[in-house]
Amino acid sequence: MARYTGPVCRLCRRETMKLFLKGDRCYTDKCALERRNYAPGQHGQGRTKVSDYGTQLREKQRMKRTYGLLEKQFRAYFDKADSMKGVTGENLLVLLERRLDSAVYRLGFASSRTEGRALVRQGHFLVNGRKVNIPSYVMRPNDVIELREKSRKITRINDALDGVMRRGLPSWVELDREAFKGTFKTLPVREEMTTPAFQEQLIVELYSK
């Protein structure tokens, strides 16, 4: 299955929840979901009864689309989460937040995870002083992400940083705006991962069938 390249606002409408795929636009009344809070297409406003399986499948699609993963990649993360100690659904969310592209987004270097992935691949970041261009690189507590010197005048990065300074950062990361440097302080806990509001247990139930 190829990666989706169409209008990302349609994905939020399809899932009937904000997936925060469009940067600052998602926080304004220009958000497509604010204007049309129903699925796209001719029958988008129609009411249909959704089965338990359908509800579970939708939740999986929401999480996959939020983190920009294909089914094979997502299933690999789930299998790893399932093999770990603790609650599988919570483990899954933590693994996804530990991706470098997610950390770049959470720190505000990118306005969306998709943009974060592109910036990582283009080699704009150092992790603990070493260039890393793999979006799935696994972050560890106290890892330091630094924007390379030659990238610090890029307008879209500075705009994204200004945006996150207004909105605030999640508790598991820390940003030094002036130094273009951020720290992945600790592993996030479930209570802190509130946006988007996933029901990860539905995904566990789906894959456990």
From Swiss-Prot:
Please list the GO terms describing molecular function. Answer: rRNA binding; structural constituent of ribosome
SUPFAM superfamilies to which the protein is assigned, alphabetical: Alpha-L RNA-binding motif
Protein name from the UniProt record: Small ribosomal subunit protein uS4
InterPro entries in the record: Ribosomal_uS4, Ribosomal_uS4_bac-type, Ribosomal_uS4_N, S4_RNA-bd, S4_RNA-bd_sf
Pfam family for this entry, one? Ribosomal_S4
Organism of provenance: Syntrophotalea carbinolica (strain DSM 2380 / NBRC 103641 / GraBd1)
Q: Which domain of life is it from?
A: Bacteria
User: Which residue range or ranges hold the S4 RNA-binding domain?
Assistant: 98-159
NCBIfam families for this protein: PRK05327.1, rpsD_bact
Q: How does it assemble?
A: Part of the 30S ribosomal subunit. Contacts protein S5. The interaction surface between S4 and S5 is involved in control of translational fidelity.
The keyword Ribosomal protein is annotated on this UniProt entry? yes
Its biological purpose is as follows: One of the primary rRNA binding proteins, it binds directly to 16S rRNA where it nucleates assembly of the body of the 30S subunit. With S5 and S12 plays an important role in translational accuracy.
